[in-house]
């Protein structure tokens, strides 16, 4: 696979690696960005552990809470201009309310919205506004108390990041603080038991490779891996993370002080995981010249 300057730039920005190191990592891994990040980490050349994911899709996430039940819905548009459109926002708000009564995004597409299905409403709005729109996903959360938070809100209850937190005990104040923490830190799971085993094993293999590169004795390597995996779990799981409001406490400890237990959460970000192809300027000009 041909390694482009844009690929090298993206890898450098996501890891802090030097230009030649980034290029070598991509060559060694046939252009696979995630594998290149892991390769750099193994060699001790990546200053940042997080992998960058391009999230160029636009739209809105809307959150609605009704008693002990909450829902987050993502509706995508082609441009941010449409996401700021009042008609689009009203439609998204209606879709989110309809989502409270269904369990899957497929059911939501067929749900009633003002006498039409959600799918038909979307089709009509595409014709009216003149831009493609998609109902991408929905997620539901239930608990004794469910609290919502929207980061970078476009209007009430919708924005670029929507968070729902389920609590047992406590009050809305601690729930709102935890929700803001989730929006900012983006934990992978609630607790160690909830972490995807595949993600844990992949990280373990990376740490094994890093430790063995040190050339230290096996017993020392084992302790290094154990310590680094504990750190990985603490940084990846909500309950074990340092609370952004008070870093002296974990989220679990802060909630406990407020008389609450966090039982679940959902975080939905617009465009998360979607990659949009980008042409460089020369390619755009060439395509335009061809008519």
Curated annotation (Swiss-Prot):
Its main location: cytoplasm. CDD domains: UBA_EF-Ts. It is found in: Cytoplasm. Pfam families: EF_TS (PF00889). Keywords: Cytoplasm, Elongation factor, Protein biosynthesis. GO terms for molecular function: translation elongation factor activity. Transmembrane segments: none annotated. Residues 79-82 are annotated as: Involved in Mg(2+) ion dislocation from EF-Tu. Signal peptide: none annotated. The keyword Protein biosynthesis applies. InterPro entries: EF-Ts_dimer_sf (IPR036402), Transl_elong_EFTs/EF1B (IPR001816), Transl_elong_EFTs/EF1B_dimer (IPR014039), Transl_elong_Ts_CS (IPR018101), UBA-like_sf (IPR009060). One of its GO terms (cellular component) is cytoplasm. Belongs to the EF-Ts family. Associates with the EF-Tu.GDP complex and induces the exchange of GDP to GTP. It remains bound to the aminoacyl-tRNA.EF-Tu.GTP complex up to the GTP hydrolysis stage on the ribosome. NCBIfam families: tsf (TIGR00116). This is Elongation factor Ts.
